[in-house]
Regions:
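Conserved class I S-adenosyl-L-methionine
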Residues: 136-163
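Glycine-centered, small-residue-biased loops immediately flanking beta-strands
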Residues: 38, 133
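A short acidic, Gly/Pro-enriched loop at the edge of an enzyme's catalytic core
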Residues: 96-106
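A short SAM/SAH-binding and catalytic strip from SAM-dependent methyltransferases
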Residues: 104-118
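Class I SAM-dependent methyltransferase SAM/SAH-binding core
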Residues: 41, 47-93
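A short glycine-rich, Lys/Arg-flanked "PGG" loop and its adjoining helix->strand segment in the class I
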Residues: 119-131
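Core SAM-dependent methyltransferase catalytic element
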Residues: 176-195
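Conserved SAM-binding loop and adjacent beta-strand
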Residues: 10-26
Length: 195
């Protein structure tokens, strides 16, 4: 996964996260179905909006994986006294930090586009996810479809579904919470295999 390369991209990322994501975040976290005994990871935590929602469900443990140093500083300041572990590693390799089959839920909001190669990330998610664990992707494919394909690698749902199905049971739906800017694809992956 890549961090924003320029100040302009970083600024755009922050504004998009703040204004367009709140309804998507609320809906996504609700759909994830977090319970008190869950270990939850958010990949690409950005400014921490989704972490606030996750925190409201009072899971046993929360991990925030964020490769941007700038966003990690924001997270460290915002959640300094919370039960949230902030990780700066790329999500493709969390082996030194998260043991096998210890995570119940993984949330990724507007992150799938940057996971390259996608299979490497899916293999790592499979490793850390408990049997019957769930991954929830919230994606807006239409707005990013015309962006630079060197950066935005996974912008077509139909093209990424075969990779997702190699590792997990997959369900997806187009969600319209009422505002045009909050429409998104909800992709839920379930780890039905024990290994």
């Amino acid at each position: 996964m890549r961090k924003p390369e320029t100040i302009i991209l970083s600024h755009i990322a922050k504004r998009v996260m703040f204004f367009a994501n709140q309804k998507v975040i609320e809906d996504s976290v609700t759909r994830l179905g977090i319970s008190a005994d869950d270990v939850v990871i958010e990949i690409g935590s950005g400014n921490g909006q989704a972490l606030e929602e996750i925190k409201n469900h009072d899971p046993e443990k929360i991990y925030a994986v964020e490769i941007s140093e700038e966003f990690r500083k924001v997270l460290q300041s915002r959640f300094k006294d919370e039960n949230i572990t902030i990780i700066g590693n790329d999500a493709s390799d969390l082996s030194d930090l998260i043991p096998d089959k210890t995570v119940n839920k993984i949330l990724l909001i507007n992150v799938i586009y940057f996971l390259d190669p996608l299979d490497t990330y899916l293999e790592e998610f499979k490793r850390i996810l408990k049997p019957d664990g769930v991954i929830f992707f919230s994606c807006r494919f239409r707005p990013v479809g015309g962006f630079d394909p060197k950066i935005f690698k996974n912008t077509d749902l139909e093209k990424i579904l075969p990779s997702l199905r190699k590792y997990f049971s997959v369900s997806s739906e187009y969600v319209d919470p009422g505002e045009k800017r909050s429409r998104y694809h909800a992709i839920q992956l379930t780890n039905h295999e024990g290994g």
